[in-house]
């Protein structure tokens, strides 16, 4: 008979995080603060999309941004130029944020004067999808150069998101990217997901994205 214990750490970590996430979500709802968790792989255009999003909505919402990275403050410096409130979060080598880290970030950001908070999660299609941050909605970006088969390779990320932005559609003619095939792969995983093709560089699709956000913020505040 073995004289040692086996502790299922992963299950315990997820269960604890889920509890923290629900508590945070209730606090955000009470305070009427909408939190968007934005995820993608590195280089998909998250920061450029954020800049376009802030430009479209800054006159309607008090926007605060949390930039999560393993290191550096390049993205926070970029977002600061938009006039939005911003804080840089260093994860100390971790490839995701969990609910506890997100709460720390919100406290550091200061949300008394923020009604729309955006978390730009660490660039990664695996780890961020596994941890509930306590967000109101989950969004992800897939860029055209990454390929239309990413939903087949990273199904969890596409399964847990409420909206998918397919970015860099302005360069689609130069890549072997089948938009309809991509839609089909995503819908198999998540029939209810909203899919919005955009180009953060040219502005195409940003109006539809901004409209979706307006609707979701309003619904959140009316719950």
Residue ranges: model-predicted function:
Residues 3-26, 30-39, 44, 48, ...:
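Nucleotide-state-sensitive switch-loop elements of NTP-binding domains
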Residues 49, 98, 150-153, 178, ...:
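Residues at alpha-helix caps and immediate loop-helix transition turns in enzyme cores, especially N-
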Residues 53, 83-85, 99, 136, ...:
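Residue-level signature of transmembrane alpha-helix interfaces in integral membrane proteins
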Residues 69, 167, 199:
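Active-site glycine-centered loops adjacent to acidic/histidine catalytic or metal-binding residues
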Residues 90, 142, 199:
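Residues at the C-termini of beta-strands that transition into short coil/loop
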Residues 128-135, 144-192:
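Conserved C-terminal guanine-recognition region of P-loop GTPase G domains, centered on the G4
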Residues 172-223:
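Canonical P-loop GTPase G-domain recognition
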């Amino acid at each position: 008979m073995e004289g040692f214990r086996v502790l299922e750490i992963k299950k315990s970590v997820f269960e604890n995080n889920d509890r923290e996430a629900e508590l945070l979500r209730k606090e955000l709802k009470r305070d009427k603060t909408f939190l968007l968790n934005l995820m993608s792989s590195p280089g998909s255009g998250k920061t450029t999309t954020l800049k376009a999003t802030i430009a479209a909505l800054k006159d309607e919402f008090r926007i605060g941004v949390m930039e999560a990275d393993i290191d550096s403050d390049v993205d926070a410096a970029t977002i600061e130029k938009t006039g939005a409130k911003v804080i840089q979060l260093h994860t100390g080598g971790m490839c995701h944020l969990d609910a506890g880290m997100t709460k720390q970030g919100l406290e550091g950001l200061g949300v008394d004067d923020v009604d729309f908070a955006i978390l730009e999660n660490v660039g990664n299609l695996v780890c961020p999808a596994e941890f509930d941050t306590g967000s109101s909605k989950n969004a992800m970006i897939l860029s055209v150069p990454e390929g239309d088969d990413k939903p087949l390779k990273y199904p969890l990320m596409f399964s847990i998101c409420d909206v998918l932005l397919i970015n860099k559609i302005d360069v689609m003619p130069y890549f072997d990217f089948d938009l309809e095939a991509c839609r089909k792969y995503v819908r198999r995983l998540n029939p209810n997901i909203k899919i919005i093709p955009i180009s953060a560089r040219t502005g195409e699709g940003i109006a539809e994205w901004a409209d979706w956000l307006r609707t979701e913020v309003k619904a959140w505040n009316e719950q």
